[in-house]
Amino acid sequence: MPSEKTFKQRRSFEQRVEDVRLIREQHPTKIPVIIERYKGEKQLPVLDKTKFLVPDHVNMSELIKIIRRRLQLNANQAFFLLVNGHSMVSVSTPISEVYESERDEDGFLYMVYASQETFGTAMAV
């Protein structure tokens, strides 16, 4: 069973800043993204990992397809993805644009997923 602690709870701010610095140095065309299951989610499984390096040209719809595939969801299973726990993002938006406007002060871009709109406005795909 994966840890119940969030990525931010498992790694100090300084560790996360250093992680991003190394990632951006070694992979300048990749966006460091943390994707975690919404804390109240019961239906969707937990991802096998939370840290993703996403090519900067990928748009949100491609990222959603990747996550749905990793979760092994079928076509009729609901899936909502929120950036920073609150922001709806157009599926055609490149991840690089989302990163520029929504990245955390530690340098990571944080997203949560759930099977319902339990947290207000969400993006259904």
Curated annotation (Swiss-Prot):
Residue positions of covalent lipid attachment, annotated as Phosphatidylethanolamine amidated glycine = 120
* UniProt keyword Acetylation present: no
In the bilayer, the protein is annotated as: Lipid-anchor
Question: Gene3D superfamilies per the record?
Answer: Phosphatidylinositol 3-kinase Catalytic Subunit, Chain A, domain 1 (3.10.20.90)
| One Pfam family it belongs to | ATG8
Keywords tagged on the record:
Autophagy, Cytoplasm, Cytoplasmic vesicle, Cytoskeleton, Lipoprotein, Membrane, Microtubule, Mitochondrion, Phosphoprotein, Ubl conjugation, Ubl conjugation pathway
Family note: Belongs to the ATG8 family.
The Gene Ontology biological process terms listed for this entry are: autophagy; cellular response to starvation; establishment of localization in cell; mitophagy; mucus secretion; positive regulation of mucus secretion
Can the keyword Phosphoprotein be found in this entry's annotation? yes
Q: What does this protein do?
A: Ubiquitin-like modifier involved in formation of autophagosomal vacuoles (autophagosomes). Plays a role in mitophagy which contributes to regulate mitochondrial quantity and quality by eliminating the mitochondria to a basal level to fulfill cellular energy requirements and preventing excess ROS production.
Which gene produces this protein?
Map1lc3b
Lipidation sites (Phosphatidylserine amidated glycine): 120
In its UniProt entry, what is this protein called? Microtubule-associated protein 1 light chain 3 beta
Q: Where in the cell is it found?
A: Cytoplasmic vesicle, Autophagosome membrane; Endomembrane system; Mitochondrion membrane; Cytoplasm, Cytoskeleton
Q: Mind telling me which residues the site (Cleavage) is annotated on?
A: 120-121
Fill in the PTM field for this protein. The precursor molecule is cleaved by ATG4 (ATG4A, ATG4B, ATG4C or ATG4D) to expose the glycine at the C-terminus and form the cytosolic form, LC3-I. The processed form is then activated by APG7L/ATG7, transferred to ATG3 and conjugated to phosphatidylethanolamine (PE) phospholipid to form the membrane-bound form, LC3-II. During non-canonical autophagy, the processed form is conjugated to phosphatidylserine (PS) phospholipid. ATG4 proteins also mediate the delipidation of PE-conjugated forms. Phosphorylation by PKA inhibits conjugation of phosphatidylethanolamine (PE). Interaction with MAPK15 reduces the inhibitory phosphorylation and increases autophagy activity.
Question: Assembly and partners?
Answer: 3 different light chains, LC1 (a cleavage product of MAP1B), LC2 (a cleavage product of MAP1A) and LC3 (produced by one of the MAP1LC3 genes), can associate with the MAP1A or MAP1B heavy chains. Interacts at microtubules with CABP1 (via EF-hands 1 and 2) but not with calmodulin. Interacts with FYCO1 (via C-terminus). Interacts with TP53INP1 and TP53INP2. Interacts with TBC1D25. Directly interacts with SQSTM1; this interaction leads to MAP1LC3B recruitment to inclusion bodies containing polyubiquitinated protein aggregates and to inclusion body degradation by autophagy.
Propeptide ranges are 121-125
